[in-house]
Amino acid sequence: GGQPLQNKVQLKGRDLLTLKNFTGEEIKYILWLSADLKFRIKQKGEYLPLLQGKSLGMIFEKRSTRTRLSTETGFALLGGHPCFLTTQDIHLGVNESLKDTARVLSSMTDAVLARVYKQSDLDILAQEASIPIINGLSDLYHPIQILADYLTLQEHYGALKGLTLSWIGDGNNILHSIMMSAAKFGMHLQVATPKGYEPDPSITKLAEQYAKENGTNVSLTNDPLEAARGGNVLITDTWISMGQEEEKKKRLQAFQGYQVTMKTAEVAASDWTFLHCLPRKPEEVDDEVFYSPQSLVFPEAENRKWTIMAVMVSLLTDYSPQLQKPKF
C-alpha cells in the first residue's frame, strides 16, 4: 500500500480491543474526530445522523455507569440504535459457544461493545465476528477510558507531547491502557504501585520498548511521592476492581499512603491536574484534590461520550472531521 491521501487515517471495519494495536497517528485521529463531533454537536448544535440505520450490540458481564450511558446516548445521538444485554440475556461462552454468538451478532448488529471478565473472550469474538468488536473494559485493558483522558488533557494543556503522567495506585487495566499509548504521544510515565500490585510484566516490557522508540521515560516505583515528583497529571483509580471485592481488607492495607492529597500535589509540577475515571472512593483521593479547580474528573467523564462517538463513527463510517486538526 502507498501513502494514504493527505493524512486520511482509515479505521473503518477495525476492532478496538487494545491501544497496543493502534499507532499514535491512529489514536490522534480518533481524538481529532472526538473534538470535531463535540464542536459540531455541542457548540454549534448540529444534528449529525452519521449512524442512521445502524445497530450496536452492547454485552455487559459487569455493571457500568459511564460506559453504558456514554455509549447508549452517544450512539442514539448519531441516529443509531443501541441494544443493551446483561448476563441475564446473554452469557458469553455459557449458553452457546463464543463462535456461535459472534456469528449471530454479526448478522444482526453493525458493531458490538463488550464489557467482559476475560480479554481472551474479546479476542475470540473479534476473530469469529465479521463486524467491529470494541472493548468496553476487560481484566487487562480499558482503552475507551484512556481516549477520554487524552482528549481532556489536550483540551486543558493544548497539547500532549512532553507531559509527564504520574500514576499512583493499582497496576490495573486503566494503567495498562495508558502504558500502551502514552509514549506514542511523547508523554512520560511515572508509576507507583504497592509491592505485589505492579502492572503486568509483559505490558511493562512493551511500554519500555515504546518509550525507547519515542524518546520518552517510563519508571516504576513503590513510592507514591517519587512517581508524583514533577508530574503534570496525577492519576489514580479504584483500588478494588470489579470481581476483587473479597480482597478489600488486604488491598486497603496494601494501599496505605497511596491517597492523593495536596501533599502529593506539592511535589508535582506547578500546572498539575488530576484525573480519575470514577467511581471514586475518598480513600483514593481526598475531597480537597478531587473537588479542586485542578481536578478534571467531570470534563473527563463527559468526554467518555464524545470519544466513544468518535470510535463508532471511525469504525462504521467514511466521515472525515471538518474541524482543523488539534495540536497533540
From Swiss-Prot:
Modified residues (N6-succinyllysine): K44, K54, K62, K118, K195, K205, K212, K248, K263, K281
GO molecular function, one term: amino acid binding
Disulphide-bonded residues: none
Active site, renumbered: C277
Activity regulation comment: Negatively regulated by lysine acetylation.
Reaction(s) the record says it catalyses: carbamoyl phosphate + L-ornithine = L-citrulline + phosphate + H(+)
Signal recorded as keyword: no
Keyword field: Acetylation, Amino-acid biosynthesis, Arginine biosynthesis, Mitochondrion, Phosphoprotein, Transferase, Transit peptide, Urea cycle
Gene3D superfamilies, per the entry: Aspartate/ornithine carbamoyltransferase
A Pfam cross-reference name: OTCace
Binding-site residues for carbamoyl phosphate, renumbered to this chain: S64, T65, R66, T67, R68, R115, H142, R304
Protein family membership: Belongs to the aspartate/ornithine carbamoyltransferase superfamily. OTCase family.
Family matches, as NCBIfam families: orni_carb_tr, PRK00779.1
Protein's name in the database: Ornithine transcarbamylase, mitochondrial
